[in-house]
Amino acid sequence: MTTQLEQAWELAKQRFAAVGIDVEEALRQLDRLPVSMHCWQGDDVAGFENPEGSLTGGIQSTGNYPGKARNATELRADLEQALRLIPGPKRLNLHAIYLESDTPVARDQIKPEHFKNWVEWAKANRLGLDFNPTCFSHPLSADGFTLSHPDAKIRQFWIDHCKASRRVSAYFGEQLGTPSVMNIWIPDGMKDITVDRLAPRQRLLEALDEVISEKFDPAHHIDAVESKLFGIGAESYTVGSNEFYMGYATSRQTALCLDAGHFHPTEVISDKISAAMLYVPRLLLHVSRPVRWDSDHVVLLDDETQAIASEIVRHNLFDRVHIGLDFFDASINRVAAWVIGTRNMKKALLRALLEPTDQLRQLEASGDYTVRLALLEEQKSLPWQAVWEMYCQRHDTPTGSQWLDSVRTYEKEILSKRS
């Protein structure tokens, strides 16, 4: 430990103690909050089923920065490089298209055995795993419908895919001793004016009920459902709207997924957390950064990321909120994207843990909004960075921007050699 870091740490402890905050306790609490990193940043959502296929479903990964992972070995190596540079507990979020098999596997036939390498790797790296059925980038999703498809055979294919995915998710939880959160997002919708908005939603309701009909131990598997406002090619109507999934999660008591980019640009998910928690048992968060639309830019340490973290901490939702990331930027170094976004999420959580929330709540209850605002602003100037650097030091990860040296070396020695 450097003398400079030690000095900054001691001063920070004193400054935060003066406002009633125990920084050691804050770091202990931070170690209770894993962040689930998304595997698809590493290869632009290509997967291993058909890596040369097109990304569909109304989502886009833009850019052509060299060095993207081309197979599972490369993707896991890239993830390991990122993991070494991020302090504290982490998880990995997988999509079904990241299966491994010597022969083609239909999506409705995926099995736990196709993900055994991921499980062994997760064990070696002390990670939990989360999962997602992949209801896009497939011939049977080409017309814009999956679980709400009017063709019963196609609809059943996607139902069976989601059911098979739940078995994979439960396998993750059994093997790793931590529940896998499996999130269902579908791209279903229409480009233009839609006459019958009810029938697709009725089909989706019935399909989801069939999907979740098999019971699993919640210690192994948790179901989540995710809404979206619109997608490219589905601008006018989205079957799985916010109202649909809020109703579904409430009535079926599944988890509800809130994606930061899946709402109108004037809406923020930080304001939805407390409302949803009154009705659903759990929330899954997809922290992202929408720029004018669901662009999935790399997460910043901005006001909304901080507000999301503050909602979790202020209301002690550690055991009911699952924090995941969802962005994919192909215009920058993909390992760096993981590191930047995940470290920013953890910084936001730390800053929230260093807030004198009880004092602020008392001021609010007494109607002293002047002091509430003043203290919230003064809080921003307290030396949280020194606490963060100590956290990095204790987890044997680089402080400040030192992690960039490791990424540059990895790019020169590994990524630059990929064609």
UniProtKB/Swiss-Prot annotation:
Keyword Cytoplasm part of the UniProt annotation: yes
Ligase is among the record's keywords: no
Keywords per UniProt: Cytoplasm, Isomerase, Manganese, Metal-binding, Rhamnose metabolism
Coiled-coil segments: none
The protein's required cofactors: Mn(2+)
Top EC group: isomerase
Family per record: Belongs to the rhamnose isomerase family.
Function: Catalyzes the interconversion of L-rhamnose and L-rhamnulose.
Protein name: L-rhamnose isomerase
Provenance organism: Salmonella enteritidis PT4 (strain P125109)
UniProt gene name: rhaA
